[in-house]
């Protein structure tokens, strides 16, 4: 139906590499952020204000300035988001085995959370960072969210876009010649690259 982007960084990277129309980006971003805010509000409604006592358990992204600097947090988030984007493009490439996307992407996310979580809370998703932070601010539980947030959003967007360009350079999955609407919902095709090479 929609390509199941879920992540604004994924949408941005797909648009940057001509896999998705730029005109569709605002609507996707709005839906993704609204979903993140709605999810955070649902948790608040379900568990009450007690949920904010758990800090990161509510999903609020944060990094300890005594352990991780602002620049280090940006680098880690960019790298982690890039790894996720690279895995996504690799598994949806039609040269990859079919039916493994959910498992592979899920395992990559788990691995990223385990390794990056202690450093930056492993956002890897601007909407996932923004939703809980905004809701926590509404509750008055988190007051430096703007400082923290800007360590995540640029890193997530940039890391995903760089990874997408690197994937195209390394794997050469295709040269975009199909209608852009078709490229949104269908995976890359190796034969599209081959046929384009003979044009």
Please place each PLM-identified region on the residue numbering.
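Membrane-interface helix-loop junctions and terminal tails of multi-pass membrane proteins
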Residues: 1-199
